[in-house]
């Protein structure tokens, strides 16, 4: 049966033709594995690191149902070197393999294996990694994280998958970290050596995730669906992801309700702006259209050199000439909730709105959101 496997390349949505192949037998399906949880997350990050995108094969609805309801692997069916090769497990650390089956009766008693049971999944939930090995799709993995870990952690994972970054698949612990003990592994710097990230292509869009969540059941999926409008696309660093989440998410989650932002947004300069900047246009990290406000994250890379500073100064003068206010945020400022709130107040003022955050214990909520996001992207709490 011929099918199409979808991947995101530099040109956008790409369809890759898959050769015609025979249907797997019932015995082959029974011995197959469906990876979920940490195992699927590790493998997805390994695939993005190696390929730059996800090359796995889509299944048609009938195939998905047959795989889910037939998979019941035994210990003899699980060959660890193959799972290490495709990135599902780390060869360096002892960890449970996370597998998905369609019913409790399909589980086998095996040491080192954690089972998740789900009798039905929406179309587009399972991808074929290679014959006999399947994984949750990016959308389905976000829902699994929302149900098993938390909604903000799932939002952070979705933001990673919508961005041009992938966190490391190596090491004993993977973000999102869930305890202070494992947080100690990360460094204070923006790009800790223990975690790091890779430049890749996005494998998800906010609209695609929202469409998937619309047919999912359960409170966790519905809560995550409400957060989809606050996701951004094509971000290029973990700190940009944290910055946009803080400024975009509603007050009730600990955010500052300044969204939506347009990322990588091109502003064409008029004659005066071109004359003062020497540039035909500027590309904004995060542009708030209603406020005519450009929010820039200033990391160390590319901004600390003399040439980089001069470029930024000219660019900012061009934007100011166009009536666009520019604010530059760094890691230190993002850790100061009073400073972030002052900037959010200014954005609301530019939108002709009053900044009214009436959430009880709002500072604690804001700090909790910041530390949860930092943990999700492999950074220590502040």
Positions of PLM-derived features:
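Short gly/ser-rich loop at a beta-strand->alpha-helix junction or flexible surface loop bordering the NTP-binding
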Residues: 1-220, 359, 369-382
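Surface segments flanking catalytic/ligand-binding clefts of nucleic-acid enzymes
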Residues: 192-382
């Amino acid at each position: 049966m011929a099918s199409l496997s979808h991947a995101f390349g530099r040109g956008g949505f790409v369809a890759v033709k898959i050769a015609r192949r025979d249907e797997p037998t019932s015995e082959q399906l029974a011995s197959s594995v469906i990876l979920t949880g940490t195992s699927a997350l590790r493998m997805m990050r390994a695939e993005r690191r190696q390929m730059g995108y996800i090359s796995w094969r889509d299944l048609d609805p009938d195939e998905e149902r047959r795989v889910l309801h037939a998979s019941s692997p035994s210990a003899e069916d699980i060959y660890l070197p193959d799972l290490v090769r495709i990135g599902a497990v780390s060869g360096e650390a002892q960890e449970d393999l996370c597998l998905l089956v369609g019913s409790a009766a399909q589980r086998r008693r095996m040491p080192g294996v954690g089972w998740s049971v789900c009798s039905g999944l929406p179309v587009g939930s399972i991808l074929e990694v290679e014959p006999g090995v399947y994984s949750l799709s990016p959308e389905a993995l976000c829902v699994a994280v929302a149900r098993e870990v938390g909604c903000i952690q799932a939002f952070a994972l979705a933001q990673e998958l919508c961005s041009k970054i992938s966190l490391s698949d190596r090491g004993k612990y993977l973000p999102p970290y869930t305890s202070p003990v494992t947080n100690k592994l990360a460094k204070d710097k923006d790009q800790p050596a223990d975690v790091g990230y890779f430049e890749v292509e996005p494998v998800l869009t906010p609209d695609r995730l929202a469409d998937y969540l619309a047919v999912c059941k359960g409170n966790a999926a519905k809560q995550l669906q409400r957060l989809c409008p606050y996701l951004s696309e094509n971000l290029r660093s973990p700190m940009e992801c944290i910055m946009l989440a803080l400024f975009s998410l509603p007050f009730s989650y600990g955010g500052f309700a300044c969204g939506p932002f347009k990322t990588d947004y091109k502003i064409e300069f008029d004659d005066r702006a071109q004359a003062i900047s020497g540039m035909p246009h500027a590309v904004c990290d995060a542009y708030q259209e209603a406020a005519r406000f450009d929010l820039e994250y200033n990391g160390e890379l590319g901004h600390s050199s003399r040439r980089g500073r001069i470029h930024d100064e000219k660019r900012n003068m061009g934007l100011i000439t166009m009536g666009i206010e520019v604010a530059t945020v760094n890691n230190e400022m993002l850790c100061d909730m009073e400073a972030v709130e002052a900037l959010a107040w200014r954005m609301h003022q530019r939108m002709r709105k009053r900044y009214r955050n009436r959430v009880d214990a709002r500072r604690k909520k804001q700090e909790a959101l910041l530390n949860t996001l930092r943990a999700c992207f492999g950074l220590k709490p502040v």
